[in-house]
């Protein structure tokens, strides 16, 4: 049998990735458009998140001011067909591909509105959609502002600057909270420019070190807020560029960090062309923040199969003001805060979309009633309805204790500890 050149390149590149680290990735031509969306935050489409509910795909969040929003599409509206093709049974990726296209082209979308069940066919002109990197900016107390930053796509620095300037126009700014929780990172240069909003021109933010030498990234403009008190929120989902912003502000004693230890992704990623319009996203170095510490949590260089070992906090470094900080394993906050406990069962319900399903149903029943998010509380009757709706669904869930018992049983059988099996059986 003949093997195509495309397949040979794909097999070879995939094998390279398996031997190096989990971030080295082969990107064939058909995946490059998704990669571009992740890095630029822009695509041609109608401007909405979508999700699956049963056999159908529904609109999960039309972006404010997007073509979908202007066409009257609301959260929970069901997609019946796209350009005459029934959407029943389709996966999210299939419907997403149909909705996307070149800007200024028309897509015909047949929908069923959630609130009144009315069926409508909309002719929507696609536009160049920019996914907002700053989904929220507002006030949490007199003089204290809060900005949520979700990812480091192209142009997010300008978004951050505009958000700050808008807050300054609204009132006196006495302090600012930057929320980088669950921000997975993105473009390094955007992170450097954001740090430059709060630090003097010429400040070193990060340097990269690899086989081809090192490169130093410094701020290039006068700061917008050189002295404003800053607090930065992080958690174990804060990674890469988010860790660079948080870690550099900590090293420069420019902000206080609160939350949980960050993820620990301090690897430099570069894209190399392979031919046939395919690319290899390759790890080429590591990031080092101003104190000299590296934030990478896993060392993949010492394992033949690219599995890696955890980096133990081993070396002490000093912040600009002389405080002691440690390398390896991500960024440790100045003020550790325990995360709010959420059971694995609740997380499973959320991941499967069952909670959003109930919210849609709730809105359908109560959309005409006055609603104040600051005082809203779910009634006992509504909670019972929610519980019954979950009981009617199949939830593929296994408790942590059940999983631990299964692992104990496997270990006992593998090591021929027959005498333990009876004791394990009593626990089941």
Label every PLM stretch briefly.
Residues 1-5, 28, 37, 58-62, ...:
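Cleft-lining beta-strand/loop regions that shape enzyme active-site pockets
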Residues 1-25:
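N-terminal activation segment of mature serine protease catalytic domains
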Residues 241, 253-254, 258-260, 264-323, ...:
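Polar, glycine-rich mid-to-C-terminal structural blocks
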Residues 51, 110-114, 288, 318:
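A generic structural motif
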Residues 44, 51, 101-108, 267, ...:
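A short, compositionally biased
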Residues 11, 23-61:
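PDZ/PDZ-like peptide-tail recognition elements
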Residues 294-428:
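Conserved functional hotspot residues or short segments at active or partner-binding sites
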Residues 61, 90, 123, 283, ...:
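Short linear motifs in exposed loops
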């Amino acid at each position: 049998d003949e093997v195509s050149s495309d397949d040979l390149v794909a097999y070879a590149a995939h094998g390279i990735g398996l031997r190096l680290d989990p971030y080295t990735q082969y990107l064939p031509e058909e995946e490059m458009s998704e990669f571009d969306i992740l890095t630029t935050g822009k695509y041609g489409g109608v401007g909405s998140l979508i999700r699956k509910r049963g056999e159908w795909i529904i609109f999960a969040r039309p972006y404010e001011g997007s073509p979908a929003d202007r066409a009257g599409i609301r959260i929970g509206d069901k997609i019946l067909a796209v350009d005459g093709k029934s959407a029943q049974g389709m996966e999210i990726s299939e419907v997403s591909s149909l909705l996307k296209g070149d800007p200024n082209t028309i897509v015909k979308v047949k929908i069923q509105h959630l609130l009144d069940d009315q069926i409508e066919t909309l002719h929507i002109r696609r536009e160049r959609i920019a996914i907002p990197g700053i989904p929220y900016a507002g006030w949490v107390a007199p003089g204290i502002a809060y900005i949520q930053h979700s990812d480091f796509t192209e142009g997010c620095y300008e978004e951050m600057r505009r958000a700050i300037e808008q807050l300054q126009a609204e009132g006196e700014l006495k302090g600012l909270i930057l929320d980088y929780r669950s921000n997975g990172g993105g473009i390094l240069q955007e992170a450097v420019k954001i740090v430059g909003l709060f630090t003097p021109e010429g400040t070193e933010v990060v340097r990269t070190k690899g086989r081809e030498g090192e490169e130093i990234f410094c701020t290039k403009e006068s700061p917008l807020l050189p002295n404003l008190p800053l607090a930065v929120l992080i958690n174990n989902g804060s990674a890469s560029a988010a860790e660079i912003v948080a870690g550099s502000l900590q090293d420069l004693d420019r902000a206080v960090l609160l939350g949980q230890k960050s993820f620990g992704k301090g690897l430099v990623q570069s894209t190399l062309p392979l031919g046939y319009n395919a690319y290899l996203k390759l790890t080429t170095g590591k990031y080092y923040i101003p104190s000299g510490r590296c934030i990478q949590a896993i060392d993949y260089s010492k394992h033949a199969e690219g599995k890696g070992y955890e980096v133990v906090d081993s070396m002490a470094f000093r912040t600009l003001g002389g405080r002691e900080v440690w390398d390896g394993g991500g960024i440790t906050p100045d003020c550790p805060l325990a995360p709010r406990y959420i059971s694995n069962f609740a997380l499973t319900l959320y991941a499967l979309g069952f909670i959003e399903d109930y919210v849609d149903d709730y809105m359908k029943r109560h959309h005409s009633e006055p609603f104040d998010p600051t005082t809203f509380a779910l009634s006992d009757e509504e909670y019972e309805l929610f519980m019954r709706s979950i009981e009617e669904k199949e939830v593929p869930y296994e408790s942590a204790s059940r999983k631990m018992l299964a692992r104990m049983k496997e270990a006992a059988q593998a090591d021929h500890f027959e005498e333990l099996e009876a004791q394990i059986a009593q626990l089941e």
